[in-house]
Design a protein with these regions (language model features):
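Conserved catalytic cysteine-centered active-site region
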Residues: 29, 61-117, 149-152, 163-167, ...
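Active-site-proximal alpha-helical scaffold in enzymes
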Residues: 92-123, 170, 176-205, 262-270, ...
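Short glycine/threonine-rich loop-to-helix capping motif typified by GTGT followed
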Residues: 65-71, 218-219, 224, 292-299, ...
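Active-site pocket-shaping loop/turn-to-helix segments
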Residues: 17-43, 63-66, 89-106, 115, ...
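Flexible glycine-/small-residue-enriched beta->alpha junction loops
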Residues: 116-174
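N-terminal extracellular/periplasmic Venus flytrap/periplasmic-binding protein-like
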Residues: 16-17, 27-28, 32-37, 48, ...
Length: 343
């Protein structure tokens, strides 16, 4: 989608909760309440904007099997106390669900279908339920299989090729093999990520965007490891391969998390109604598919397509933010962009 030639779309504000770890501070907080919290925060921080002017609320939600209640965006609208006339819709593009929400809201604004929208994402991996498939007949004999909806495949179609249904961690191992990414390189990259996050917190760079959840004693991200050392990371054993060939560990993988984030998006008219200066303008977006066993390399082609739509090149970008599901996955993507400064 290239939207620059249609209507300009502005990011007016951005908020998020602190990110809680699996079973951590947000263990007792429902995902619809997390989503409502960031929606309400955006409204409260923009007092000049009449909430009735919000044309849509779009949220990404990759799990959505439990308290998300089918359409967590609409639940957030109602729980946040917005007018009942404000609609809400939930989208799912797995790890990219929150970004997909931003794309869809921006597209609506660019095409004139909306002037003001809220777009975000929410997950509670802690509270994602266990599920059991309904039997095909009454009173079946034997036992029923149960799946966790926190992460990974469930109720896999037997027609799906086995190499496509591997775990995310095994996919990271395949990427490490493909590019010869060592365990040491992954650990160094992960350690640097934690250092950057800790330094950003210390410098107050997150203070304006983070909105703590009332009643929960959490004001900073729970999973940032301050003071980690190469020696500590080296002691951890590989999680997904135990045959001596594994390189992916808990330390160089993303943790399981709970949290929510949201953006306030507008066109020119909506921007004027907020009385605010924009943080950014959305120029272009793109999505792409890839062999499922190499899912983490999807950003490479998507970034190239988005840059082409925007008429830009990597050299035009001042800051480049890349999803880091696994250090191996991020390093695999960076193989395509050797000119980037990894700092």
């Amino acid at each position: 989608m290239s939207i620059r030639t249609v209507r300009d779309v502005y990011v007016v504000d951005a908020v998020r909760t602190p990110i809680g770890k699996f079973g951590g501070a947000f263990a007792k907080v429902r995902p619809d309440d997390l989503a409502a919290h960031v929606v309400r925060a955006l409204v409260d921080r923009t007092p000049d904007l009449d909430p009735a002017r919000i044309d849509d609320v779009v949220f990404g939600d990759a799990n959505g099997a439990g308290e998300d209640n089918r359409d967590v965006a609409r639940m957030a609208v109602l729980l946040a106390g917005l007018p009942v006339t404000v609609p809400g819709v939930t989208v799912n593009r797995l790890c990219g669900s929150g970004l997909e929400a931003v794309i869809q809201a921006a597209r609506a604004i660019a095409l004139g279908d909306a002037s003001v929208a809220i777009a975000g994402g929410v997950e509670s991996m802690t509270r994602a339920p266990w599920v059991v498939q309904k039997p095909e007949r009454a009173f079946p004999a034997g036992h029923q299989e149960m799946w966790s909806t926190t992460l990974g495949w469930r109720m896999t179609n037997p027609r799906m090729p086995a190499e496509w249904t591997i775990s995310l961690g095994e996919s990271a191992e395949l990427i490490a093999e493909k590019y010869g990414i060592s365990r040491e390189a992954q650990d160094r990259f992960a350690l640097e990520s934690h250092r950057k996050a800790a330094d950003a917190w210390a410098a107050g760079l997150y203070d304006k965007e983070v909105v703590p959840y009332q009643g929960v004693d959490l004001v900073r991200d729970e999973c940032v490891r301050e003071g980690s050392t190469p020696e500590a990371l080296a002691r951890l054993k590989p999680v997904f391969r135990t045959d001596g060939t594994g390189t992916v560990t808990a330390a160089n993988s993303t943790p399981l998390n709970d949290g929510a984030a949201a953006l306030l998006l507008t066109d020119e008219e909506g921007l004027a109604a907020t009385g605010r200066e924009p943080l950014a303008r959305i120029s272009a977006s793109a999505v792409t598919g890839i062999e499922p066993q190499f899912f983490g390399l999807g950003p490479v082609e998507a970034v190239q397509n988005a840059l082409a739509k925007a008429g830009r090149s990597l050299g035009d970008l001042g800051v480049f933010e890349l999803n880091e599901a696994f250090a191996a996955q991020a390093l695999g993507c960076l193989e395509a962009w050797p000119e980037l400064d990894r700092a």
